[in-house]
């Protein structure tokens, strides 16, 4: 049975070998108005109120770059991530900016001063953090009074039936090779469902307004390309052997073909 350290190493290895994969996927998933999850998250920012912004788990710096361009370099931006490989890509991307980048876990941000950010953002990484309470404690410490913390997280697995079907196809192949995979998931399971996350946030931010908003995103492609891209949503798919990965992609492709009306 994998330990917490094993899971963290798995997470780091996936990002080391697949730098920049998160934005490649997320950038193509859009709502009915054509907005992706980065657009939706950045909508919470107000340049008159949010001068100092922290991106937790900034990865390759995609959202920092987007934010810097959208606000014409007028915000003081900082990013932290556990992956040195992702941060190396971020430094190249943000080379000609004043954006600060640090390698650290979200639970260990002692180098950031109390009440130093008006806004803290986290894109698609909160459910991977464990333990999560210290993350919220840290956010509360470094967030200014009347500041805002906003995150994009995975939706409840049962919100969209198609998502659950895809999950089951991928895990079928993963558990054939690693029977115990999934017995312990990456991160804190409470951050993967809205009810538990809401209660946890209320406990951590007792003096703040807490809201969770469901938002459905879509990704359209031909079945073969869709199978390849959708598999990248799941960290589990990265542990498969070449043979297993190929079989999984074919199964996903056939599933999508069967859904074409």
Predicted regions: what is each one?
Residues 148-219:
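Conserved catalytic/acceptor-binding region of the Class I
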Residues 133-148:
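A short glycine-rich, Lys/Arg-flanked "PGG" loop and its adjoining helix->strand segment in the class I
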């Amino acid at each position: 049975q994998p330990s917490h350290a094993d899971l963290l190493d798995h997470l780091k290895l996936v990002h080391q070998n697949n730098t920049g994969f998160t934005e490649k996927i997320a950038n193509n998933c859009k709502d009915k108005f054509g907005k992706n999850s980065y657009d939706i998250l950045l909508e919470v920012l107000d340049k008159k109120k949010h001068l100092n912004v922290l991106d937790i788990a900034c990865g390759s710096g995609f959202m920092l770059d987007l934010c810097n361009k959208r606000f014409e370099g007028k915000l003081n931006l900082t990013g932290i991530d556990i992956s040195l490989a992702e941060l190396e890509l971020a430094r190249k991307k943000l080379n000609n900016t004043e954006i600060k980048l640090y390698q650290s876990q979200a639970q260990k941000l002692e180098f950031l001063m109390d009440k130093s950010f008006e806004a803290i953002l986290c894109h698609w990484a909160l459910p991977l953090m464990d333990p999560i309470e210290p993350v919220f404690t840290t956010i509360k410490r470094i967030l200014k009074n009347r500041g805002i913390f906003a995150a994009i997280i995975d939706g409840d697995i049962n919100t969209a039936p198609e998502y659950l079907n895809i999950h089951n196809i991928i895990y079928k192949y993963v558990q054939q090779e690693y029977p115990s995979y999934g017995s312990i998931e990456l991160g804190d399971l409470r951050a993967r469902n809205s009810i538990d996350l809401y209660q946890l946030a209320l406990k951590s931010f007792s003096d703040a307004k807490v809201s969770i908003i469901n938002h459905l995103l879509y990704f359209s492609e031909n079945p073969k390309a869709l199978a390849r891209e959708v598999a990248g949503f799941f960290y589990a798919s990265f542990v498969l052997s070449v043979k297993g990965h190929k079989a999984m992609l074919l199964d996903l492709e056939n599933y999508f073909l069967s859904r074409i009306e």
